[in-house]
Amino acid sequence: MGAMAYSLLLCLLLAHLGLGEVGASLDPSERPDSSRERTSRGKQHGQQLPRASAPDPSIPWSRSTDGTILAQKLAEEVPMDVASYLYTGDFHQLKRANCSGRYELAGLPGKSPSLASSHPSLHGALDTLTHATNFLNMMLQSNKSREQTVQDDLQWYQALVRSLLEGEPSISRAAITFSTESLSTPAPQVFLQATREESRILLQDLSSSAHHLANATLETEWFHGLRRKWRPHLHRRGSNQGPRGLGHSWRRRDGLGGDRSHVKWSPPFLECENGSYKPGWLVTLSAAFYGLQPNLVPEFRGVMKVDINLQKVDIDQCSSDGWFSGTHKCHLNNSECMPIKGLGFVLGAYQCVCKAGFYHPRVFSVNNFQRRGPDHHFSGSTKDVSEEAHVCLPCREGCPFCADDRPCFVQEDKYLRLAIISFQALCMLLDFVSMLVVYHFRKAKSIRASGLILLETILFGSLLLYFPVVILYFEPSTFRCILLRWVRLLGFATVYGTVTLKLHRVLKVFLSRTAQRIPYMTGGRVMRMLAVIVLVVFWFLVGWTSSMCQNLERDILLVGQGQTSDNLTFNMCLIDRWDYMTAVAEFLFLLWGIYLCYAVRTVPSAFHEPRYMAVAVHNELIITAIFHTIRFVLASRLQPDWMLMLYFAHTHLTVTVTIGLLLIPKFSHSSNNPRDDIATEAYEDELDMGRSGSYLNSSINSAWSEHSLDPEDIRDELKKLYAQLEIYKRKKMITNNPHLQKKRCSKKGLGRSIMRRITEIPETVSRQCSKEDKEGTDHSAAKGTGLVRKNPTESSGNTGRPKEESLKNRVFSLKKSHSTYDHVRDQTDESSSLPTESQEEEVTENSTLESLSSKKLTQKVKEDSEAESTESVPLVCKSASAHNLSSEKKPGHPRTSMLQKSLSVIASAKEKTLGLAGKTQTLVMEDRAKSQKPQPKDRETNRKYSNSDNTETNPNSNHTEELRKPQKSGIMKQQRVNLPTANPDASSSTTQIKDNFDIGEVCPWEVYDLTPGPVPSEPKAQKHVSIAASEVEQNPASFSKEKSHHKPKAAEGLYQANHKSIDKTEVCPWESHGQSPLEDENRLISKTPVLPGRAREENGSQLYTTNMCAGQYEELPPKAVASKVENENLNQMGDQEKQTSSSVDIIPGSCISSNNSPQPLTSRAEVCPWEFEPLEQPNAERIVALPASSALSASKIPGPRK
């Protein structure tokens, strides 16, 4: 038997190889037929596939992908112990189960048998069965096999069955049945079986018990299933070719048993032995073999089957074919099914792996089924049998991977961020409102002192600096990261560029140590310099943005992720090297600002603005340094909420503080009394700084020469300036004066009050003068004739009835002289002043007028009071420079000049005070010795000619000056005073003798500046406008310094010749006149309107006064002749020219002295031609000169006028 078995195996091998050789040795003529046969069989097979793949409840691989159906069937149909064994693989569960027969897993979800055959662990057994079946087909279809009987070939069949178990270890049992007749007998005649028992193979001949195969049961389904499928209806075209041709035809089509598709698969089953299930799942593979009848018709001969142990075969529930395929319970939208190999024939051998962004709430077992121990009884409920629902939950937002519900991305505090963005929006709104408020109060002194355009620029830049907090509130993106750099750098350049340039302008203007005028940095020039700075920053940002866009093309992102100490990630704008460079640039720029703050630390300013700007710059430097340090060191570990709060704190500690430092003092200063800062404040408005000289030695008139300013503003300011100069002149005159007694009195407070209010003229003065005028109009003409002698040139000016009305209706806008650069306030500001202050001013001014006009006040009292009051207010002579504070109310000239501050008193107040005192003392002594006798005669002459001049000019002035608006205040000379039309020869004669007359005869006090003395030499100023002072007798010492820069040195000799003819009364006229003339003058002041005329010339630098004698004809620059010719042309314009002139002429002291001098009358006529006008003037015209006399009285006390 062993030899026969081995020979049978060798035959099987040769038969298998022979089939391949026969197929390869076919001739070409037969191959087309073979291809056609294969094509027809493929079509037949394709038509049969739908039926083969239809779900069949009797097989376990029916198509079903719902895992819930499997769980329900296992719970309802499968015995409890069998289901537990199927899930756990524990064979102890089967020992408790009783059985009467085999149990098959039929009707469960699965795939078709044709797809199940692809399992790799079953390929060996399937191939072995197929080869054995093909061998039997070949043997039975040969001619010789027909002649042999079954009994003769029994040994060969036994050897074939034995070889199947020896050739494939997975086969546990093999059997073969053989029938002599195909369908006549229901049971086979031969039934051979080989069983593997541990290490040996048991071969049995069960032919005697083969009759039980005739019954169709589950155990005999492998035989009856194949027998029922056989039908003898197959007819082939090669049936008439003989046995040889028929054999070739069968071999070409591989026979009926030569294909794996002909193998029948049984469902997995458990065998029942001795009333219990044997452990291990089995499957039966069976295939039929056929023979040929004598007429070459194939007939069914038998079935060969093998039982395969499935205990080592894995169930792949994740696969698309095979047993229980597609029965996993993983959710494919959030998880993925992964089979687990090596667990055997058990269910649940897979795991649901959550996809990216999902996690499972708990860690589950390897096969997703809790294996039960041997003592655990299967409950049979659906919950226990069914698999757990493997639902993967999504991770927190922003987490690509997670293991639990903990967030991997930083969770933002919504309420905190909402509060921050709300407050930031409020601050931005307030910043915008501040821009509107600043524009609304653009005419206020505090706003104009800093410059409206510059303040608006700072507020706009602050609005840009508020935007980084708004950008960081949103999720970082490439656009937002780029925009963050833009708003930060542009805002920084705008705000702190403007602040630094303002400090630079203060440094250039206030700390210039030269008397020469320097190019002044106006607001427009500062804006141009700021535009250069912003343009540089803009160009850098454009280049940086271009490089960032190029990096994006190279996959270099601008937005990255940071990680906190808690391993929480967050998105952030990455920091590159350019950020370090911009931080260094900001630091260096702020260092320059700190240097400027240190340089201008001693410069006095209005509202202390440089001081506040210095605090803002230092604060920005310190806070920004801390901010950049934290940002660069902790940026990758600082979560977005902290970064937002860092930007928020940095913004408000710098930007908000800067805005507060610049705006709060401006709006809060109006409520404080600025009297303490009278001598130290200096406005730095671009108009003020550009329209004032650098020092007092620069001509004050040159401050207005190149600006299209309002002449009224100029006159208002100059009137106050001349009043201050008068105070200093009187102080120097009484200093060390041997003619005055040294006597201390108790009226020092009166002097202080005079000095404090010396530049203030309240409305009460006008009302008081108007009341006195009504009472003393009857004798005003007689008093006026005595006064005209002192001021004959006043009659030639435009002084008349309009001055009287203007003085009554005028509201003096400046109540007090704040400092060097005081501003002229509007009528609205005046009306809102406190009543207590006006009452105090009224009392003070009444006391001032009484002190100046009273006969009982001795000269000694004047000396003491004025000396004490002057010393109580330091540096009061400093130029106010507020002439352009009202320039925004009126359109300015298109061309702006560049002028400087007059701060000479700040530099050398003590030195000049001593120098002026010495000169004034000498002047007073000489004038008093030379001018006592000829004084009455000179006064009579002056009275006559001043009356005639006033008669001619009064009607025109009355008509034209009433048309002026009465809002402006101040009694100032016009910038161009026309000669009287009644005396045209005077103009021509003045032009002809310009080079011949002696300066000493006209203005003797001006020669003091040309003589060597203790007065420090001061450089000459440039082209200027000579504006006449109110009274030459009262301010020769102060005016001499201004005019000394323009006097020719040849005037020294002529001055010495006529110097002795000056009388004391000409220098100090108030000492010789009584109280009555002063009272008359005070009564007439209210009748004299003081509307300042407008010199409407296009070029303000060409406006010169034509007064030659003691203020009426002041000294002219080298272009004096051309200016005089222009005056003659303007005289022909008649009333229009007279309308533009308003003057408070002074008493020509030089002319009086010339009348008393021994010089011929003709020389005096050349100097003062108006004194020799025809005397045929009507007597009624003498009364017209009284307003001029009253104006003289008003000019004697110029202090309270402002």
Swiss-Prot record:
One of its GO terms (molecular function) is transmembrane signaling receptor activity. Glycans are attached at residues 98, 143, 215, 274, 333. The chain crosses the membrane at residues 418-439, 452-474, 479-501, 526-547, 577-597, 612-633, 643-664. It is a multi-pass membrane protein. Residues 85-281 are annotated as: Cache-like region. Disulfide bonds join 99-272, 481-573. Residues 1-24 form the signal peptide. Glycine binds at residues 172-173, 271, 307. Residues 440-451, 502-525, 598-611, 665-1202 are cytoplasmic. The Cache-like region shares similarity with the Cache domain, a well-known receptor for amino acids. It acts as a ligand-binding module that recognizes and binds glycine and taurine. This is Metabotropic glycine receptor. It comes from Rattus norvegicus (Rat). The lineage of its organism: Eukaryota, Metazoa, Chordata, Craniata, Vertebrata. The gene is Gpr158.
